[in-house]
């Protein structure tokens, strides 16, 4: 059962239990239907439902019965396993929220089902041991893909209003209706906020933070912070161009299905995890 490679998956057949500490929170609306847990060495995403912070707050120890769940390698995750087609293949016509072809699994669809797989242990706290700290001097040696899904404190990042790989930052993306629409604050005189609400439509905001003097790619040293238009801090003012910040976030990676267009993204649970210097 090789789960390596983009979009690979395997349904767990053995009676396996995973223990971890919750390191993400959806309380402020930026983390969506996901729970990240950390076992002291590596992290994994659990694809669940809304309002996970109620039963699984930050620091909560959880035990996950993995048998019957699907382990996917695109951003290591556990979620619901799709029913196989008669020929043994995975379905490709599932709704977007349950798009197994893209990620290898889907969100466990009900709270009752979640409780069958995810059990609470003791309530702990997030400690220094749970957070990897990087800065401009060590990020090249400390950061690697083994830390994807982990909680990272990026110290001394610089906000950069610039264009990298043909994308201009900050920008605002709407894809709720299946049509991708980018808006740039320069073109439309938009307020410079983490995300945006435009004509009653909520847009994801993408802003760039970097350790590089002149960022030329998003594969090393430059990171995109994506904020949902539904996040409580969506309309908070974005740090000014060249402002210095510390950001504590889940370290994630986006790639096209072919494995190209790699972008490292930072998933922020709370506005307090962004500190302007």
Say what each PLM segment does.
Residues 1-32, 36-61, 65-277:
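OB-fold nucleic-acid-binding modules
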């Amino acid at each position: 059962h090789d789960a390596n490679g983009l979009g690979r998956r395997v349904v767990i057949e053995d009676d396996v239990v995973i223990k971890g500490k919750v390191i993400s929170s959806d309380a402020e609306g930026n983390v969506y239907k996901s729970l990240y847990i950390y076992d002291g060495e590596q992290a994994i995403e659990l694809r669940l439902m809304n309002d996970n912070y109620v039963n699984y707050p930050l620091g909560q120890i959880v035990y996950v019965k993995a048998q019957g769940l699907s382990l996917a390698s695109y951003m290591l995750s556990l979620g619901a396993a799709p029913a196989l087609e008669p020929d043994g293949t995975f379905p490709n016509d599932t709704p977007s929220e349950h798009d197994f072809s893209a990620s290898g699994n889907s969100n466990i669809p009900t709270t009752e089902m979640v409780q069958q797989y995810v059990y609470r242990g003791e309530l702990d706290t997030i400690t220094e041991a749970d957070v990897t700290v990087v800065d401009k001097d060590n990020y090249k040696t400390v950061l690697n893909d083994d830390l994807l899904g982990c909680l990272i404190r990026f110290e001394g990042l610089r906000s950069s209003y610039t264009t990298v790989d043909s994308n201009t930052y900050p920008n605002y993306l709407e894809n709720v209706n299946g049509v991708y629409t980018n808006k740039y604050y320069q073109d439309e005189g938009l307020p410079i906020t983490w995300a945006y609400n435009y004509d009653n439509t909520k847009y994801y905001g993408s802003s760039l933070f970097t350790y590089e003097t002149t960022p030329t790619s998003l594969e090393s040293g430059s990171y995109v912070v994506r904020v949902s238009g539904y996040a409580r801090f969506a309309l908070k003012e974005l740090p000014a161009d060249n402002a210095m910040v510390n950001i504590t976030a889940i370290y994630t990676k986006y790639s096209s299905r072919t494995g190209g267009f790699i972008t490292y993204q930072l998933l922020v649970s709370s506005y307090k995890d962004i500190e302007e210097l």
